[in-house]
Amino acid sequence: MAEESLLPSHTEDVSASPNKSSSLLSEISNASTRPFVLAFTVGSCGALSFGCIVGYTAPTQSSIMKDLNLSIADFSFFGSILTVGLILGALICGKLADLVGRVYTIWITNILVLIGWLAIAFAKDVRLLDLGRLLQGISVGISSYLGPIYISELAPRNLRGAASSLMQLFVGVGLSAFYALGTAVAWRSLAILGSIPSLVVLPLLFFIPESPRWLAKVGREKEVEGVLLSLRGAKSDVSDEAATILEYTKHVEQQDIDSRGFFKLFQRKYALPLTIGVVLISMPQLGGLNGYTFYTDTIFTSTGVSSDIGFILTSIVQMTGGVLGVLLVDISGRRSLLLFSQAGMFLGCLATAISFFLQKNNCWETGTPIMALISVMVYFGSYGLGMGPIPWIIASEIYPVDVKGAAGTVCNLVTSISSWLVTYSFNFLLQWSSTGTFMMFATVMGLGFVFTAKLVPETKGKSLEEIQSAFTDSTSEDSTIF
């Protein structure tokens, strides 16, 4: 199946032809069916829950420690066990989604989240508290990759980027809401509130469609066209789309008939997409995201900025960047937003490093706090614009259905380990050198900019089958890359 190249140097604007505007309006209209909207709402709920889960511990720390008589070590373990759950969820997410399907996996993640919140809400000691947090981590580890996959496999090509980008906004909404509510609501009540999204979603899961690409993969070809009709509208002609999905699925199966299991992912033909997915998804973590997120108060305090003002402004900027990303991702494209976002995060890290250097050497004392505040705002705004949602969008687009589960496991595992590494080491790095720490983060983002410019293709406007075949058909070698 020969397709045009997706290499950056040959990228074209597939929506630039005169007839594309009417086609785009038609696809948007067709996509606005009840099953599509319902599926999008349900599929994105994992991101909303993720934001609530991450935002829960900061405002509730003192009250939980007081009520349950916990030590600092107890609460630190409660906070960090989420990462253990993330890693466990990452290890099983791909196999689970491939084995039982996208919808049943969403069932499992929402049940885990619900049990986790209830365990925390009714905890009498640290053991039940930790169990609830662990279950939440497993759920997030699964849903953080499953959500973008499910949305990308259902959405029409012209809405795929915007629909997936909205998931990052849901994370921000959940995070901001729980930060705000946590100052006014008791920690047990806040946990009950956290269970509401799952309680709403569970009955809706009876009415959402399974991914047509997963149906094709498991041999349920007769159901593919019916699902597409429900998603695009009963009057839509989905025969070409259904034929493309079925043809490409058979094409992949014929190529890999002698290759089975997890290690199929490590064939040479998957080397480039695997590298792109792993690097892009881990880059924000290695570029200091968790350091900024969990230790913003430390950064502001060290440079003389009011943490309350800093948090409010950075939240507004990040949400604004996220909204702009949703609006622009299917217009300007993934690659250009990635480059702009990486450049902004690089400048934010660099400016933060300079502000620490000036503060340490007692230079420009009146301007250093303002510089620190602006640098953090630039970092978070740039992250929300591109590096937040787009790596997950691209990772959900570039892998064929037969290795998508394995790729999800690898990408999720790498980002979970990267997240833990930066979170664990950040305070030690600050003690070593505040300036040096943020210079390291700036270096990561600078290298990421070069990586994206050289290797990351533009996927805007392409069908999933076009994107995937452009990678996998570039070589017929089946030898592994290690």
Curated annotation (Swiss-Prot):
| Name of a matching Pfam family | Sugar_tr
Classify the protein's membrane topology as the record does: Multi-pass membrane protein
Task: Provide the Gene Ontology terms for cellular component.
Answer: membrane; mitochondrion
Q: Which GO terms describe its molecular function?
A: sugar transmembrane transporter activity
Its annotated compartments are: Membrane
Which residues does the annotated region (Disordered) include? 1-20
Q: Does the keyword Transmembrane helix apply?
A: yes
Q: What is its main location?
A: membrane
Matching entries from CDD domains are given as: MFS_GLUT6_8_Class3_like
Q: Which UniProt keywords apply?
A: Membrane, Sugar transport, Transmembrane, Transmembrane helix, Transport
Domain of life, per lineage: Eukaryota
Q: Does the keyword Thylakoid apply?
A: no
Q: Which residues cross the membrane?
A: 36-56, 72-92, 103-123, 134-154, 166-186, 189-209, 271-291, 309-329, 337-357, 370-390, 410-430, 436-456
Q: Which family does it belong to?
A: Belongs to the major facilitator superfamily. Sugar transporter (TC 2.A.1.1) family.
Q: According to its UniProt entry, what is the function of this protein?
A: Sugar transporter.
Q: What is the protein name for this chain?
A: Sugar transporter ERD6-like 14
